[in-house]
Amino acid sequence: MITRLIHPICVAVMLIIASACEKYEPDWDIFEAYGVAEEIKTDFYERYSEDVKVTSAVTSYNKSQVEFVDTDGLKCTAVYKGHTWMMTQKEFNKNGFAFLKQLPERIAKAYLRAGVSKEFYEWDQSYVIEVTRRGFDKKAYEFQFVVFDENEFPKLAYREYFVLIDEDGELLDIRSRHNRSIWWYDMSGCVDFVRQKYPEATILAGINDSSDNVLYIKDKGVLKTVRFDYRGSDEQTWSATIYRLEDYDKLPDTVLDEYAKYRVYHPDFNYSEVYRVETKDGIYYGLKSATTSLTVYFKA
């Protein structure tokens, strides 16, 4: 009789313990636990829904950073300044070029058309990310990698490359390494300037080059690069707007005269591309050599 009673009693005790554990399990709120404002939590879940998995939420001074895994299983980071969302970065799997299957098809095709080869993504500093910024009209896709120089010795010699593609699959730039976008999350001042100076423009992407912000815009169908100078304390001052001219665009007579004088001392110089550079000091024209990376500038 005693043996028969032991089993039901054990079962009852286990059920009570399980019920108690379920009842007293703490309601873990990672935002509250690390002092992240309720306003940020509310905005975050309105922006990304409760289907994402938040892995970290931290506030330091006036900056908050929320790390999470989205519904596609990709690691993301949202950055807030005060209670205002500034940007979100989504990371794609760089190993084995897995990102080519994770990216939107038009972005993957644009990357393959960019003309780069022998990319090495196993480098610690390499990455493939999607960047969404406050005030920008489009998302941007950044690819950071290295290419080993086979003509150099030792074989460890390499060059860093950065490819920038906009949301519609247009190649915006191929250049050397720049600062990580997440370090320069606030470009609101530069956005305000572009909205005033180029009211019809579409803001496509933004990067930071040696502390200077660079915005890529499409203004009346023309792709332009808007550069700013860093003045400290997040202040950026416009320095130049640069864009390539079409082959049929005529150069000002003053530029043609200066080019003729230049050719007297540099008879082998011929240009294949022309860039218009707008600055506070006036308009310049950059004539890019047809055979080298040299660009010669003449003031209009």
Where are these regions (language model features)?
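Compositionally biased, intrinsically disordered low-complexity segments
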Residues: 5, 9-20, 110, 132-134, ...
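Bacterial Sec-dependent N-terminal signal peptides
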Residues: 2-5, 12-42, 48-51
